[in-house]
Swiss-Prot record:
EC number of this enzyme: 1.7.1.7
Enzyme class label: oxidoreductase
GO MF terms held by the record: GMP reductase activity
Keyword terms, alphabetized: NADP, Oxidoreductase
Record-listed NADP(+) binding positions: 209-232
Disulfide bond found in the keyword field: no
Recorded family membership: Belongs to the IMPDH/GMPR family. GuaC type 2 subfamily.
A biological process term (GO) from this entry: purine nucleotide metabolic process
Active site residues per record: 180
SUPFAM superfamilies in the record: Inosine monophosphate dehydrogenase (IMPDH) (SSF51412)
Gene3D superfamilies: Aldolase class I
Protein name, entry field: GMP reductase
SMART domains from the UniProt entry: IMPDH
Length: 330
């Protein structure tokens, strides 16, 4: 067994960060921006590239307002037009690809049409794969200027291999998401120890990590940054908004929106190899308000960390307070 796995397993609810002496008069002085690729974004948060979280309209709004996004890959025939549309608007294009044979043809098509996205994400449930490594090498050969994220992975070995293949960033998290049941269906994943997995991966990472899944509270963003994340991918907390895809459903006077995992029956259209589920999330109003609240809470986190920017969070001490009730799913 790798020595990394002798470390104690913990997750977000098991960790509390330890405050340092504050040096700012107000949290408003704290800067939450993060450089990712060649661009700087307002906060280290990106909505999950799931069909129930992001669509073209929301992608445009996010890009226009200084937020990072990754468009999902579940309407593959629309991706080239999406890149063209974003570029015509003077915005950056960020897309997802898979690893099947026709994706190689798609990459060739983009090169032929000179539709090179600024960001590309290889989106695979089990990213520590020879096929993912082959796709990384192909994309970096054909589109060397695209900032390439690959995932998802759970181990330091996987991070090393994807980085060595040419990935510019790696996405960490296998099945910890609220709409994901990978750990229940397969016995594998980072559900219940996602934060520890992030910590282990950060020990070897030379390039940025995206923490993907398991975020239940705004404070979890700061915890992700503390344990090595440059960016935090969030699904359920950024679903259910006015701008979010999904049908609006009213039950007993309360308003909800549909939310489903990328490997769910809803997504696949059939009950086969299902590792996701469908659920209802409360209607939350405008996503702008939620993102602003995340920014303000992160500013408070920076203040507690005794700094002025995100770097200060990476240096704070922490304590492990085992919470057996709230560990994992709740």
């Amino acid at each position: 067994m790798n020595n990394y796995f002798s470390m104690e397993a913990f997750d977000y609810d098991d960790i509390q960060l330890v405050p340092n002496k504050a040096i700012v008069n107000s949290r408003k002085e704290c800067v939450t921006s993060v450089k990712f690729g060649n661009r700087t974004f307002k906060i280290p948060v990106v909505p999950a590239n799931m069909e129930s979280v992001i669509d073209e309209k929301l992608a445009v709004w996010l890009a226009q307002n200084g937020y990072y996004y990754v468009m999902h890959r579940f309407q593959p025939e629309k991706r080239a037009d999406f890149i063209k549309m974003m570029h015509e608007k003077g915005l950056f294009a960020s897309i997802s690809v898979g690893i099947k044979d026709d994706e190689y043809d798609f990459i060739d098509e983009l090169v032929e049409k000179d539709l090179i996205p600024e960001y590309t994400t290889i989106d695979v449930a089990h990213g520590h794969s020879v096929y993912v490594i082959d796709m990384i090498k192909y994309i970096k050969e054909k589109m060397p200027d695209t900032f390439l994220t690959a995932g998802n992975v759970a181990t330091p070995e996987a991070v090393r291999e994807l980085e060595n293949a040419g990935a510019d960033a790696t996405k960490v998290g296998v099945g910890p998401g609220k709409a994901c049941i990978t750990k229940l269906k397969t016995g594998f994943g980072t559900g219940g120890w996602q934060l520890a997995a992030l910590r282990m991966c950060s020990k070897v990472a030379r390039k940025p990590l995206i923490a993907d899944g398991g975020i239940r509270h705004n404070g979890d963003i700061a915890k992700s940054v503390r344990f090595g994340a440059s960016m935090v991918m969030i699904g359920s907390m950024l679903a259910g908004h006015e701008e979010s895809p999904g049908n609006v459903i009213k039950i007993d006077g309360k308003t909800y929106k549909q939310y489903w995992g990328s490997a769910s029956e809803v997504q696949k259209g059939a009950y086969r190899n299902v590792e996701g589920k469908q659920m209802l999330v409360p209607y939350r109003g405008s996503i702008a308000n939620t993102l602003e609240e995340m920014k303000e809470d992160l500013q408070s986190s920076i203040s507690y960390a005794g700094g002025r920017d995100l770097e200060s969070i990476k240096r704070v001490d922490y304590v492990i307070v085992k919470n057996t009730i709230m560990n994992g799913d709740y």
